[in-house]
Amino acid sequence: MMFKNFPFFKGKKDTSFDHLVEEVKKGYIPEHIAIIMDGNGRWAKRRAMPRIAGHHEGMQVVKKITKFASKLNVKVLTLYAFSTENWKRPKKEVDYLMQLPEEFLGTFLPELIEENVQVRVIGQQDRLPTHTRRAMEKAMEETKENTGLILNFALNYGSRDEIVSAVQHMMKDSEEGKVRVEDVSEEMLSSYLMTSSLPDPELLIRTSGELRISNFMLWQIAYSEFWFTDVYWPDFTEEHLLNAITDFQHRGRRFGGV
């Protein structure tokens, strides 16, 4: 089921936000939340600002939502930062997007370390500029022992490409006698994906009002709950995330059963 903006906060204006957070934490919190962070460019356009201004503002929201997800005891937060299709955007915008990880981690990494957050990346890293790769590698190295929230960036990521790559590696292992055809299963294919060490997302959020998946974690979201909002990513708040989780808690997940 797909809902927009579950009205959890209506009639609760006199209740403190912190109390609401504690109430939500009494319920089941999705272990893995994935977010398609959409609408940065349109947010900027509405304000007669360049698109890169929207991306910069969106980066501030990443910091805020990461901290809040950690507070809620979410185990994995995957953020769709840059797709394999995003290279088609204007060069100036792409160049800025490739600078963002360096800028983001340059200012936020100490806080991530303090918050016990572990940074990971999925996607084709070999095509990223050297400075972008180095920034991500530094963050992963300095947080690899952290045991709190896993902040997983999907950077130059495309799900179809991921699945093709997984099948190619599986076929290579089969040719080398490491895999038998009769052994191939969902679990085996999952083990070849970039997310092999992570649970599948239980909740997928997309901002900006678009109702599509955009080649994001197609295998992993087979049983995810979807939550869409018209809010552009730079305007996304802790309250919106709490709304999404509360909506998730009110749904019945049957996994094909009755």
From Swiss-Prot:
EC number: 2.5.1.-
MF terms (GO), sorted A to Z: ditrans,polycis-undecaprenyl-diphosphate synthase [(2E,6E)-farnesyl-diphosphate specific] activity; magnesium ion binding; manganese ion binding
InterPro entries from the UniProt entry: UPP_synth-like, UPP_synth-like_CS, UPP_synth-like_sf
Disulphide linkage map: none
Lineage: superkingdom: Bacteria
Residues that coordinate or bind substrate: 39-43, 51, 55, 83-85, 87, 89, 206, 212-214
One BP term from GO: polyprenol biosynthetic process
Quaternary structure (record): Homodimer.
UniProt name for this protein: Isoprenyl transferase
Organism of this sequence: Bacillus anthracis
Lineage, opening ranks: Bacteria, Bacillati, Bacillota, Bacilli, Bacillales
